[in-house]
Amino acid sequence: MFVLPPPQEPLLGAHTSAAGGLHNALYEGRDIGATTIQLFTANQRQWKRRSLTQNMIEQFQTALDETSLSYIMSHAGYLNNPGAPNPEILEKTRICMYQEIADCIALGISFVNFHPGAALSDSKESCLDRAITSFSQMAPLFETNPPLVVLLETTAGQGSLIGSSFEELAYLIQGIKAHIPVGVCLDTCHIFAAGYDISSPEGWEQVLKHFDEVIGLSFLRAIHLNDSIFPLGKNKDRHAPIGEGCIGSESFCFLMRDERTRKLPKYLETPGGPDLWTKEIRYLQKVS
């Protein structure tokens, strides 16, 4: 199984808009000074995906060449629930996952990021096992060894969501890794909301040590950069601009400098849009 190597240089960007065409997300990334981006490859709030055309693929490839952006990440749709207890929703999710991954391969995207799932009326244990099956069923798409990694995003621990603890993510990875290339996208707001104190370099040291012991740092492939409106451990997923929330700017400076995290692709999801992202990218590059 081919495993995409990590980038050789630090990459920083944001979740940009694909309005008017997927390629436009790449051009917006260039305009804000990014070296990578995240985007939705389809409407994130609908089950039905439009089919990629050869023209769409060619436009995207041209934009990749013209912008020199790399390690592009697709964020899968919000309706997906890989661990859904409802058979109908589970089947819809698996179809959508398959289409999402196939499109990412066609476009030459490096990462596809999924929320691991929600147990809803069922146990988290059963949800975790269904999610493992869902992701493992994507194996046929990887028989040609495409340079794509499926990422499981850390969650804030709200409701019945799985993936808020490193232990749950480790369980998922152990069940999936023999079938498809898999890793973790660490969302700073989410892990802070889930109780991991990353508001200081000392806190990060403990969290990274714990991550390495439970999952392994080799599985940490990308980071969502978001400050948090709410204090530590509140299980609330509310993003704030960098340095304007309860995590604080010191935490993000650490990520930009520490050798374990410096070169990991990082994607801003902060509220404020392109003008804010331009300022945040400049700031983070300055402190790196």
Swiss-Prot record:
One of its GO terms (molecular function) is deoxyribonuclease IV (phage-T4-induced) activity. Coiled coil: none annotated. Its cofactor is Zn(2+). Zn(2+) 2 binds at E153, D187, H224, E269. Zn(2+) 1 binds at H75, H115, E153. It is an enzyme of class 3 (hydrolase). Binds 3 Zn(2+) ions. CDD domains: AP2Ec. It catalyses: Endonucleolytic cleavage to 5'-phosphooligonucleotide end-products. One of its GO terms (biological process) is base-excision repair. SMART domains: AP2Ec (SM00518). Zn(2+) 3 binds at H190, D237, H239. Its EC number is 3.1.21.2. Keywords: DNA damage, DNA repair, Endonuclease, Hydrolase, Metal-binding, Nuclease, Zinc. PANTHER family: APURINIC-APYRIMIDINIC ENDONUCLEASE, ENDONUCLEASE IV ENDODEOXYRIBONUCLEASE IV. Belongs to the AP endonuclease 2 family. HAMAP family: Nfo. Endonuclease IV plays a role in DNA repair. It cleaves phosphodiester bonds at apurinic or apyrimidinic (AP) sites, generating a 3'-hydroxyl group and a 5'-terminal sugar phosphate. This is Probable endonuclease 4. It comes from Chlamydia muridarum (strain MoPn / Nigg). The gene is nfo.
